[in-house]
Amino acid sequence: MKLLFIGDIVGSPGRKALAELLPGLQAQHGLDVVVANGENSAGGNGITPDTAAEIYAAGVDVITCGDHLWDQKEVEILLDEEPRFVRPVNYPAGTPGQGSTVIERAGQPTVGVINAQGNTFMRGELDNPFRSVKEESVSYTHLRAHETVRN
């Protein structure tokens, strides 16, 4: 299985580069899953449903975010309606959205994506990212935990 993780997609130039380059990378490398950080895709300040749509259209399967999540009010739509949009799992209980998602495709291993935000030099009250990821991963142990993927 081939996975690609992309760091910050920043503004219009980042979205344009993604749209131009990702299809070729997918074809050249046979990528199975693409995860990208989109929290700065709206002019370097947050993400909107429109910028998320561009990122998904370019071939990204899951969008993660971090401390710039709340920079655009429209993000609430993504948190409420888009299962492929993953906020940090270690945000306080009751925060809208989800901290993880699962990608299931016929003939491929199931892939779980958990997003956590570090808490060093960060504002706000974040739970311990290591503890949060460990707790979240327990809910996924039933997903082909007995299989080992080698590629």
Please name every model-derived segment.
Residues I9, N115-D127:
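Flexible, glycine/proline-enriched loop segments at strand-loop-helix junctions
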Residues S12-P13, S41-N45, T120-R123:
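Short, small-residue-enriched loops and turns at beta-alpha junctions
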Residues N128-Y140:
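Active-site glycine-rich loop that binds ribose-phosphate moieties when present
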Residues I6, K16-G97:
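Core catalytic region of metal-dependent phosphoesterases/phosphodiesterases
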